[in-house]
Amino acid sequence: MRGQSRGKTMYVVPYLMAPPGSPLEPYAAGVELTDNRPVVLHMIRMARVAVAHLENLEDPATFVRAVHVTGDLENLGQGTPEDQRYFVTVADQRTILHFGSSYGGNALLGKIAHGLRQACYDGRASGRFLAEQFMLLGIVDKQTGAKYHICGGFPSASGKTNLAMTLAPDALGVRYHVEFYGDDIAWI
C-alpha cells in the first residue's frame, strides 16, 4: 500500500453505521481513508457521515480505523498466483486495510468489512448483539394489528433483496402490509 496513493487526493470519511444514540452506536463508528472519490460519495449515501459521530462517542478510541487504497487495478495480478491485492480486518484492533479494488464491498469499508466482519467480532466479544448476512422484513395484519418480523439468512446473490422487498400477494388482498427493514446485513 505504501506509495500507491502518491499524487492522489486522500479523503477522510467519518461515519456511523447505526442510528445515533442507539445501543449499537459504540460499535458503529468508523473513519475510512480512501483515494477514491466515488467511494466517498457512496459512503455519504450509505452511512451517516459527519465528524460529530466521532465527537459524541463515549470512548473516542473505539472507532474503527479503515484504510482503502485503490491501487493500479490493471497491474495487480487479480486472479493469478501473483495477485497483490489484500483485504484484511484485524477485528481485535478495530482496523481494516483493503488494497487493490474499487468494487463496492471491498471499497465501501463500512459495509461488509465493518458492518459484517468487524461487527461479528464485536457482537460476540461484547455479548450484546449478533451481526449476520440477513434480510429483515415485517408483515403487518391490518385487521388484527399483529406484526410479524421475519429474518432470513442467505448467502450473497441468493435473493435476500428480492425477498426483503416483496409485496403481499394479491390473493391476500389488502389485509397484509409488508415492511422493508434491510436486505443484506442485520445487527440484532
Show which residues each predicted segment covers.
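Conserved internal helical-beta-strand scaffold that buttresses enzyme catalytic cores
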Residues: M1-S158, A168-I188
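Hydrophobic positions on the alpha1 helix immediately C-terminal to the Walker A/P-loop
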Residues: L163
